[in-house]
Each structure stands twice: as C-alpha cells, then as structure tokens.
Amino acid sequence: MRIVMILVALLALGGCTRWAMNSHLNNANRAYAQGDCDAVMYNLSKVDRESRSRRYVQPEVSMLRGQCLERQKFYMDAVQSYQFIITQYPESEYAFRAKARLDTLHQLGHDNLAPPATPRPASR
C-alpha cells in the first residue's frame, strides 16, 4: 500500500511541475502579445528551469526568445536563437518558422551587421 501511495504522490508532483511550466509559458506568450519583453524573458527563464527534462518545449521557448530579441533590436542574438532551433530541432515546425525569420532578417539587412573578424599575427 505504501508503494501505491508513493507512486501517486510522485505522479501528482510531476503534474504540478508541468502545470507550473505551462503557466509560465502562457504568461510569456501573454507578455509578448502586450509588448513586455522583460516579462517574457523572466517567464522564459522560469520555463527553462522547470523544463530541463522536457526537451520538446525548448524550440517554442527559443522561438519566443528570438522574437523578443528582435523586438528589442538585438538582431544578432535573435539570429543565434533561430540558428539554434534550426540545428537542434531541424524537423520541428519551429525550425520552419525560424528559417522564415532568418530570411526576413536577411532581407532587412539585420543578419550580418559586421563582417567576421579575421585574425592576424601580431607584428614584432
């Protein structure tokens, strides 16, 4: 009987964690709709902490983070978020959306603001 009680308690705790994660993700989406990127980033950091074992949430979190970075004009950081989605989750719908965002940023000229640095040997 004790084993059954312990299993029920563990299942209940797992459900609470998932509920809290979904709540934070919903709050992040609501804040994004209102244009409050600080609240978005705060809620996404909570989702990150609570979803370490749930990798399926990461593409959605990264996509929302990239969109907020774009809104704040941190284009290179947004590009890196989108590239992360494409490399880590190439088959997800978020990879398709990330490619579209990268195309848009490229058309607007925000994807490569400065040429990459070329290393040169120090002169003696």
Where are these regions (language model features)?
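Sec-dependent bacterial lipoprotein signal peptides
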Residues: 1-16
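Bacterial Sec signal peptide processing site at the extreme N-terminus
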Residues: 13-34, 43-46, 51
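Short solvent-exposed coil/turn linkers within tandem alpha-helical repeat scaffolds
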Residues: 48-57, 86-100
